[in-house]
């Protein structure tokens, strides 16, 4: 009677021992946890570099690189793969029973003790290439493979676990530093966001593209159109209830568009689209500031509906009318100013033209307000008082005075506009005589591309300028002097007859 026996018992002892070694032998593939640990440790060391990196990319696992690394690890060669192409590579070997991923990455990172970042050099007789590859900022993909080698070519010991990691894009470019020093994430590429001091790719790259500034167009129904200024002499006006504005295009009627622009641009002629059109861009202010432009500019725009004064137009000699006919303009100012500032926009090329038109070549019947060109821009906190350049003839109204502006690069806060003689403030556009009543205007700032930035503050009151008060007294003396000379003999004759 034969008893049953296991087939394992029938095997020769040497073969059975070999099968047991194969069954219980060390594993050669990295587990999912080991792969994640590999990526996490790389990113941890990359985020903690010293000095900090401004362009360090976040590293992620790549299966193709892992397969390439595994294929080379199976060759059991202690040396870099000469056929790796455009791939970086780090190697690690251990004679213990299993692979230790934290120990491998930690050994690579310890090489930073021998690396001089300022000179991008390694200490003599030391290795730094593993560390520089770990922290190479442009590298963002890693794939690793391990293999158990009974014999490792180039090493005397037996039974070694070999770890091979490949990187893309490769690091260790000769003559270059591993990363750019600076504030973390301050130089991330387009399409990347900041995560734990590393530049992480955005999930939706389309959102990373620079979108143009949002422009909100004002509907045509909100604009009040008027006939062309060339045909009727009255410029077209349009207002918007937007809080901020930056682009104003005028072609027979003004319309405002809202966008976060910061500069004021004006071409030399200030007329680019049609006979009566002009294109300007004004800065969006933090506080709502009504704008009043002097020459070819849009009227003031406020948060709510704005009421404008009736245009002031005083006839002038033919030479001035011909010059003014080239550009339609009118005097516009708010009836009641709620803000102490307004904007005076000037073009660098048109400033001499404004000054040339403002200089009186012939005596006029009305006094003129002169806007002199600043000879030199003063420093911040330096304000230069300038005398008026034009001599005004006799004023028909005792309230008419000459202008004495202040020149500065910064905005000069002043008192709000004052009303005198029951008349409202009026700002001249293109060199026409000013209105009989000239009140104190707030400060005005100018910002033009290709020109100069000026802050002008006009002082109109005679009490603030003693010279102007003396000018009024002298004029009154000149007027009454001849009459007193004629009346005195008559009075003496009458006294003798009596």
UniProtKB/Swiss-Prot annotation:
Q: Using the record, list the residue span of the signal peptide; answer none if the entry has no such feature.
A: 1-29
Induction, as annotated: Up-regulated in a mouse model of heart failure.
Location in or out of the cell:
Secreted
Species assigned in the record? Mus musculus
Which gene carries the instructions for this protein? Answer: Pi16
Name this protein carries in UniProt: Peptidase inhibitor 16
Q: What does this protein do?
A: May inhibit cardiomyocyte growth.
Q: Mention any Pfam family matching this sequence.
A: CAP
Provide ranges: composition bias, Polar residues. Answer: 218-277, 344-353, 437-447
Extract one GO molecular function annotation from the record: peptidase inhibitor activity
Spell out the subunit comment. Answer: Interacts with PSP94/MSMB.
Question: Which cellular components does GO assign to this protein?
Answer: extracellular space
**What is the annotated tissue distribution of the protein whose record heads this document?**
Expressed strongly in aorta and skin, and weakly in adipose tissue (at protein level). In heart, found in the extracellular space surrounding cardiomyocytes (at protein level).
User: What is stated as this protein's family in its record?
Assistant: Belongs to the CRISP family.
């Amino acid at each position: 009677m034969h008893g049953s026996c296991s087939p394992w018992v029938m095997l020769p002892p040497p073969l059975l021992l070999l099968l047991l070694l194969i069954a219980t032998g060390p594993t050669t593939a990295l587990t999912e946890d080991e792969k994640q640990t590999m990526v996490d440790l790389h990113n941890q060391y990359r985020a903690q570099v010293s000095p900090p990196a401004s362009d360090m990319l976040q590293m992620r696992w790549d299966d193709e690189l892992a397969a390439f690394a595994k294929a080379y690890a199976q060759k059991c060669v202690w040396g870099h793969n000469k056929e790796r192409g455009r791939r970086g590579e780090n190697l690690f070997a251990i004679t213990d029973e299993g692979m230790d991923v934290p120990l491998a990455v930690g050994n690579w990172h310890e090489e930073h003790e021998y690396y001089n970042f300022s000179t991008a050099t390694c200490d003599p007789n030391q290795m730094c290439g593993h560390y520089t590859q770990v922290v190479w900022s442009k590298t963002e993909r890693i794939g690793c493979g391990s293999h158990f080698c009974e014999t490792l070519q180039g090493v005397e010991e037996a039974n070694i676990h070999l770890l091979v990691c490949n990187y893309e894009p490769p690091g260790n470019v000769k003559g270059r530093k591993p990363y750019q020093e600076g504030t973390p994430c301050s130089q991330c590429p387009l399409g990347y966001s900041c995560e734990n001091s590393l530049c992480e790719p955005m999930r939706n790259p389309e959102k990373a593209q620079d979108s143009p500034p949002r422009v909100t167009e004002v509907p045509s129904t909100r604009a009040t159109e008027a006939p062309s200024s060339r045909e009727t002499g009255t410029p077209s006006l349009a207002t918007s209830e937007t809080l901020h504005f930056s682009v104003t295009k005028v072609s027979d009627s003004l319309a405002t568009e809202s966008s976060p622009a910061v500069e004021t641009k004006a071409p030399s002629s200030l007329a680019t689209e049609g006979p009566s059109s002009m294109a300007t861009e004004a800065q969006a202010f933090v506080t709502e500031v009504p704008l009043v432009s002097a020459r070819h500019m849009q009227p003031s725009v406020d948060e709510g509906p704005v009421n404008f004064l009736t245009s002031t137009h005083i006839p002038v000699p033919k030479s001035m009318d011909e010059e003014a006919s080239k550009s339609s303009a009118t005097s516009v100012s708010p009836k009641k100013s709620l803000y102490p500032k307004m904007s005076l926009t000037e073009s660098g090329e048109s400033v001499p033209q404004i000054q040339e038109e403002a200089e009186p070549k012939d005596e006029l019947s009305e006094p003129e307000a002169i806007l002199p060109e600043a000879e030199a821009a003063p420093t911040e906190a330096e304000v230069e008082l300038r005398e008026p350049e034009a001599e005004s003839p006799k004023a028909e109204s005792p309230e008419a005075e000459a202008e004495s502006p202040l020149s500065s690069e910064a905005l000069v806060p002043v008192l709000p506009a004052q009303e005198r003689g029951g008349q409202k403030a009026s700002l001249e556009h293109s060199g026409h005589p000013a209105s009989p009543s000239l009140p104190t205007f707030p400060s005005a700032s100018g910002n033009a591309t290709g020109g100069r930035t000026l802050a002008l503050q006009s002082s109109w009151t005679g009490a603030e300028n003693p010279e102007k008060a003396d000018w009024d007294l002298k004029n009154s003396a000149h007027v009454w002097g001849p009459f007193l000379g004629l009346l005195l003999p008559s009075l003496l004759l009458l006294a003798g007859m009596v």
